[in-house]
Regions:
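Periplasmic/extracellular loop-to-transmembrane helix junction in inner-membrane transport proteins
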Residues: 1-10, 38-44, 71-118, 265-282
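Hydrophobic positions within alpha-helical transmembrane segments of bacterial inner-membrane proteins
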Residues: 63, 111-134, 138, 153-156, ...
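Transmembrane-helix boundary motif in ABC transporter permease subunits
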Residues: 25-42, 65-68, 113-148, 160
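Non-cytoplasmic
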Residues: 160-161, 165-187, 231-263
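N-terminal signal-anchor/first transmembrane alpha helix
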Residues: 2-69
Length: 308
């Protein structure tokens, strides 16, 4: 009975720690932010402030990984699969590299690549969607049909096929995933912009002689930002998971560079011996994904204008 209840005990402890982190982050933000923003944060749910704290921690790790990591990313230090000890707090991996250092550099590589990919996908998809909705006609039809064809192909299969053809370098990985996700951003941007271009203030701007880019930049984009910002967070989650999945399958970030998805595969044999080390990179992937979703959910709630 005690063995069965142990996981529930750990889950309760984890939830309590998350609540404390969320409350502490909210209290700190209320103190440092201007009064107007502090009022908004004061009423934020603990899930949102917990997500902010987690995202901030990941950003610090990404920016300061070489300073935080006790050892180098690729240095073989000792025997493989050493248990947790004072020298190696999380043991060593399948080649004898420090697991803690690999996790830190894995966060830097995975999050950095995912962010760059999301920015590229968002720029391509949002610009295409805004142009298609604003100009309409043959351009809208052409871009929409191209997106329909790309979205008809399962994204993971498309990525596997393209990476097998082009090679598994980081630029190719970023390009392929960006193409896959730009189609989703295009759909959202086009749908949002299509509802805005028929508004009276947009027609008035056209009658005043506003050019295409001025029309998009001054009239359409500011009113389309809330859903697009939320979509950016969601796209980052999907890109982050896609890159981790491809690395797990061997077509993402290549050794000896650290990547969270690849680290799960490399140390999977430890699960046979009841070692939780392979779970750590998977837990880091899940934690960031959940944190970003918490913040995006709160941002959508704010932009919708709904009241508690």
């Amino acid at each position: 009975m005690t063995t069965l209840l142990l996981p529930f005990g750990w889950a309760i402890v984890a939830l309590a720690c998350a609540a404390v982190v969320g409350w502490s982050c909210r209290a700190a933000l209320v103190l440092v932010l201007p009064a107007r923003n502090a009022r908004t944060v004061r009423h934020a749910p603990l899930t949102a402030t917990f997500g902010m704290a987690v995202i901030a921690a990941y950003v610090i790790v990404v920016l300061a990984a070489p300073l935080i990591a006790p050892h180098g990313e690729r240095i073989v230090l000792d025997a493989e699969y050493l248990p947790w000890n004072s020298t190696y707090p999380l043991g060593t991996d399948n080649l004898g590299r420090d697991m803690l250092s690999r996790l830190i550099f894995g966060i830097r590589n995975s999050v950095g690549i995912a962010f760059a990919t999301t920015v590229l996908a968002f720029l391509a998809g949002a610009i295409g969607g805004l142009l298609a909705a604003t100009i309409g006609g043959w351009l809208d039809q052409l871009l929409s049909r191209i997106v329909d064809v790309l979205m008809a192909i399962p994204s993971l299969i498309f990525a596997l096929l393209m990476l097998s053809i082009l090679g598994t370098s980081i630029p190719n990985l970023i390009l392929v995933i960006a193409i896959v996700d730009a189609t989703r951003v295009f759909r959202i941007a086009r749908a949002v912009a299509a509802n805005i271009v028929v508004m009276e203030y947009v027609e008035s701007a056209r009658l005043r002689g506003a050019g295409l880019w001025r029309l998009i930049g001054r009239e359409i984009l500011p009113n389309a930002m809330p859903p697009l910002v939320a979509e950016f967070g969601l796209r980052f989650c999907f890109v982050f998971l896609s890159i981790s999945a491809l690395s797990f399958l061997g077509l993402g970030v290549q050794p000896p560079s650290a990547d969270l998805g690849a680290m799960v595969r490399e140390n999977a044999s430890l699960i046979t011996f009841g070692d939780i080390t392979p779970i750590l990179p998977a837990a880091l992937i899940a934690l960031l994904t959940v944190a970003v979703n918490f913040v995006v959910d709160w941002a959508l709630h704010l932009s919708s204008g709904l009241k508690e």
